[in-house]
Design a protein with these regions (language model features):
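Glycine-centered structural positions embedded in regular secondary structure
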Residues: 125, 141, 159, 174-175, ...
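Short, gly/Ser/Thr-rich active-site loops of penicillin-recognizing serine hydrolases
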Residues: 167-186
């Protein structure tokens, strides 16, 4: 039975450290962020500045409350920050084989969970979905006060990125309607 679990990403981070001989954050900076030109991305630390705070609605729903971030640096399972321009650079780096080979990307976006979920499949690190018969791959993430989605449509060569510092609100509608615009779905 397929079920998404962040602990697999913690294990992947440990494997990266063992195989590369580098700590996870250094490896990601050198092999993804730097190669893709992602200068506004990284992992939270106490000195991180110029980021937007996550927000949640009060219990009464009449105000917004800032969510306090954890004190740690993050991990291979989360705790990173970025912006739209850097995620577009990431998408372009994938397409142009700057961070993985064409063969590796093909392997990453091939279905690994044998179609066990009706609406999506899973590859290596990517959720694979079809919208109106158009293939897409990407990944999202949520945490208290945060929503994120990155999706690439290879047939139309369109990438869309959503960042939200809220864990409710217009995120789902924005994601759904943007996908409809890209695919022509009604």
């Amino acid at each position: 039975e397929y079920e998404y679990n962040n602990s697999n990403y913690i294990l992947l981070g440990a494997i990266i450290e063992k195989v590369s001989g580098k700590d996870y954050f250094t490896f990601i900076k050198e092999n993804i962020l730097d190669k893709a030109g992602m200068t506004n991305s990284g992992y939270f630390a106490s000195e991180t500045t110029n980021t937007v705070s996550p927000l949640v609605r009060s219990e009464k729903g009449d105000s917004w409350i800032e969510v306090e971030r954890g004190k740690g640096k993050g991990s291979s399972a989360g705790g990173s920050y970025s912006n739209v321009n850097d995620i577009l650079k990431f998408s372009n780096a994938l397409k142009n084989n700057l961070i993985v080979s064409k063969e590796t990307l093909k392997n990453m976006i091939s279905v690994k969970n044998n179609n066990m979920i009706v609406t999506e499949d899973y590859g290596y690190g990517f959720i694979i979905q079809k919208f109106a018969q158009e293939l897409s791959y990407g990944h999202g993430g949520t945490a208290k006060g945060v929503n994120f989605e990155f999706r690439y449509f290879p047939n139309s060569d369109i990438t869309f990125v959503i960042f939200s510092n809220q864990d409710n609100g217009a995120y789902d509608d924005l994601k759904r309607n943007t996908t409809k615009l890209i695919t022509g779905e009604r």
